[in-house]
């Protein structure tokens, strides 16, 4: 059956800020306490969505989550009216207010892991929201993520939206940022590739400086609940040394699409065995794996982390050629820029490189790949998505005007204590649910 890969980007929320909450994420730590520009952040992401939609790629949008999370703050012991809760948290534990105010749900690569119907035992598209249990500000996302996905992908004939895995370190799950899929064509059965940082119940190498957020056990559990064939599921361990260098998710060091794996030579433990396993598995599905391995001598791990070369989108055009979507930081690094020029001029599958200004997201450690959740849909499944979430001229204009109306152009850490920010955010989100036709999605609407 004809199928297409759709990218659902997270719309940056009104509380976008730089609180330095993500240990292991170098950009997040380096930009802690800087002033952010939520309006610019939202517009940068929206412009990427629109340009890709204009090029013929299926492009959807996912709404922000409500922030600050009064639910979290009340759970942590702050009481009173909403304004009192915010004031008490700001005075007594500003780090908790920052966690409750994070707009990190914008990075929808961490929202869930998705398996298309061609791969699953029951022939439905399966979603497992990521528990993101390694970070407080992200661990509060999965319930709202499940609600959003259940709203957009509501037809049980076509879709299965699961609960997140239990939020324990043994089942640490960071979603699609540690998952990719290889196939001959999107609508045909493929190979699902899960990358983990450590295993809870068996000995193996682990990072020493920064935490490994994804466990083997979590990846395996997601594969089992999605009903994936064992012979079409491949697991790989990310090299712990690159985690210690700031590669906190695998999508910071590799990206895959169709029959192509674009990766750094230091991405994986026992890389040749992984390449061989993927090659054999994909060969059984009628395709030949094409590995584009970037040597450390050309682009170092530090170059990869600072430029986010691999936190790129690798997209297939209708003619089968592939385009790489990268942040502008890749052009500002001389070694990375030179490599990209060589790549595009070569005889490989990647013929074009598109460059986007995503500076606001990048300063928090999120490039093009972080901002999108890939969902392969056949024609019937796409028709079952009835909300107004597909980017076109009309929706782009509505969202652009909505951002202009509701977003601040400066948000410093001390501004999180402003109770007006909650009211502004709720007003904006209430209007957004009408634009996207998603009903009463938020707790404050119920």
UniProtKB/Swiss-Prot annotation:
The job of this chain, per UniProt, is described as: Catalyzes the hydrolysis of N(2)-succinylarginine into N(2)-succinylornithine, ammonia and CO(2).
Q: What is its EC number?
A: 3.5.3.23
- Tell me the keywords, alphabetical order: Arginine metabolism, Hydrolase
Question: Would you kindly state one Gene Ontology biological process term found in this protein's UniProt entry?
Answer: arginine catabolic process to glutamate
Residues of the active site are 174, 249, 370 (nucleophile)
Q: What class of enzyme is it?
A: hydrolase
Q: Which reaction does it catalyse?
A: N(2)-succinyl-L-arginine + 2 H2O + 2 H(+) = N(2)-succinyl-L-ornithine + 2 NH4(+) + CO2
Pfam families reported for this sequence: AstB (PF04996)
Q: Which organism is it from?
A: Burkholderia cenocepacia (strain HI2424)
Q: What is this protein called?
A: N-succinylarginine dihydrolase
- Which InterPro entries does the record associate with it? AstB_sf (IPR037031), SuccinylArg_d-Hdrlase_AstB (IPR007079)
Q: Which PANTHER family match?
A: N-SUCCINYLARGININE DIHYDROLASE (PTHR30420:SF2)
**Subunit structure and binding partners:** Homodimer.
Please give the pathway this protein is involved in: Amino-acid degradation; L-arginine degradation via AST pathway; L-glutamate and succinate from L-arginine: step 2/5
| Similarity comment | Belongs to the succinylarginine dihydrolase family.
Q: Which Gene3D superfamilies match?
A: Succinylarginine dihydrolase
Q: Which Gene Ontology MF annotations are present?
A: N-succinylarginine dihydrolase activity
UniProt binding sites for substrate: 19-28, 110, 137-138, 213, 251, 364
Any signal peptide, and if so, which residues?
A: none
Q: Could you tell me which HAMAP family the record lists for this protein?
A: AstB
Print the organism lineage.
Bacteria, Pseudomonadati, Pseudomonadota, Betaproteobacteria, Burkholderiales
């Amino acid at each position: 059956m004809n199928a297409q890969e759709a990218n659902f980007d997270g719309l940056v929320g009104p509380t976008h800020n730089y609180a330095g909450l993500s240990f292991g994420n170098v950009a997040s730590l380096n930009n802690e306490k800087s002033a952010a520009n939520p309006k610019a952040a939202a517009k940068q992401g929206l412009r990427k969505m629109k340009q890709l939609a204009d090029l013929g790629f299926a492009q959807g949008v996912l709404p922000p989550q409500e922030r600050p999370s009064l639910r979290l703050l009340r759970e942590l012991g702050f009481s009173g009216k909403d304004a009192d809760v915010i004031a008490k948290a700001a005075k007594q534990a500003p780090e908790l207010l920052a966690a409750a105010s994070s707009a990190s749900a914008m990075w929808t690569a961490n929202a869930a892991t998705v398996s298309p119907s061609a791969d699953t035992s029951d022939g439905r598209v399966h979603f497992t929201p990521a528990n993101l249990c390694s970070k407080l500000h992200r661990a509060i996302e999965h319930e709202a993520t499940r609600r959003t996905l259940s709203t957009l992908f509501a037809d049980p004939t076509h879709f299965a939206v699961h609960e997140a895995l239990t939020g324990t370190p043994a089942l640490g799950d960071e979603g699609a940022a540690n998952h990719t899929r290889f196939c001959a064509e999107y609508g045909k059965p493929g190979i699902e590739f899960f990358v983990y940082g450590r295993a809870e119940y068996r000995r193996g190498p682990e990072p020493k400086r920064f935490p490994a957020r994804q466990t083997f056990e979590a990846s395996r559990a997601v594969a089992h609940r999605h009903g994936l064939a064992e012979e079409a599921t491949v697991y790989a361990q990310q090299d712990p040394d690159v985690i210690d260098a700031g590669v906190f998710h695998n999508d910071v060091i590799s990206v895959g699409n169709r029959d192509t794996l674009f990766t750094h030579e230091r991405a994986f433990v026992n890389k040749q065995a992984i390449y061989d396993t993927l090659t054999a598995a994909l060969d059984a599905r009628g395709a030949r794996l094409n590995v584009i391995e970037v040597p450390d001598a050309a682009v170092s791990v530090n170059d990869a982390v600072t430029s986010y070369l691999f936190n790129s989108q690798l997209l297939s055009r209708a003619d089968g050629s592939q385009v790489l979507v990268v942040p502008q930081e890749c052009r500002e690094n001389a070694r990375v820029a030179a490599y990209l020029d060589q790549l595009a001029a070569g005889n490989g599958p990647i013929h074009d490189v598109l460059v986007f200004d995503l500076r606001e997201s990048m300063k928090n450690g999120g490039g093009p790949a972080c901002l999108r959740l890939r969902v392969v849909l056949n024609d019937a499944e796409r028709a079952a998505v009835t909300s107004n979430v597909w980017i076109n001229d009309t929706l782009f204009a509505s969202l652009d005007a909505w951002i202009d109306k509701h977003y601040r152009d400066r948000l410093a850490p001390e501004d999180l204590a402003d109770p007006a920010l909650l009211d502004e955010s709720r007003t904006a989100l209430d209007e957004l649910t009408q634009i996207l036709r998603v009903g009463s999605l938020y707790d404050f609407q119920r």
